[in-house]
Amino acid sequence: MKHSLSQATRAAAVALTLFSASAALAQRDAAMAGEEQHTASGLLVRQGEGSFAPLVFDPDKAPFGLRNNNWVAIKGPNLSGKWPGQTGANTHGFARFDDPAYAIRSFIELMWIYQDRHNARSATDILKRYSPAGDCSGAPSLPPRERREGGGCIENQTTAPITAMRVARAVGLRPTDNLDLFGPDGQINHPDRLRTLIDAVVTQEVGASHCPQPPRGESWIGCRVDDGLYNRAVELLTRMPG
């Protein structure tokens, strides 16, 4: 067959199909058991055939980010401050929002701060700062007493180099290349690259329990923010003074 899939590609396709099938079965079983199911409005999850559908979750079993509209696992801007729209934080500083658009808005602002103040311009530099080794989003995979300072959850260890590779590959750059996300006044230069960065971070921080993780070498991303929510986040950002 002239255009036959490579063994690695077939394996990746099978893995994604199995993930989607198991997720669908879990969702069906939860519904049959009468478990409460919520839809993460504005968050889409990749299906086995490559399409995207709204992400549905059980709030009693979901990671912190889904339960608290903080899909990017952003922390408060400092020890006592709050981002616009932030309603609180957990003991590790991860923010809670009533509206996920505010979390995405805050993430975009933070990316601009990284570029403007710290000259973090590549996927590698950005994610090493945003996701330091050993940190995590606080997903409930370990009881609080067993989590180390800063999060400490097994299922969702941050892996900045892997996430940086996913971002770079998805936009056709190397992990150390300048993403050129913002102009000198903070205007967004490349919305496609910024959105890929957001989606890769969401995929990593929400975790494999709800977002399929692409195998090494693959350029697809498991969860993405839909157009409406992204546009609302940008609008919220442009309304802010300064």
Protein language model annotation of sequence segments:
Residues K2-A12:
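Bacterial N-terminal signal peptides that target proteins for export
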Residues Q7-T9, S22-L25:
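Intrinsically disordered, low-complexity serine/threonine-rich segments
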Residues A11-S20:
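Bacterial N-terminal signal peptides
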Residues A26-G242:
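Cell-wall polysaccharide-cleaving catalytic domain and substrate-binding groove, primarily
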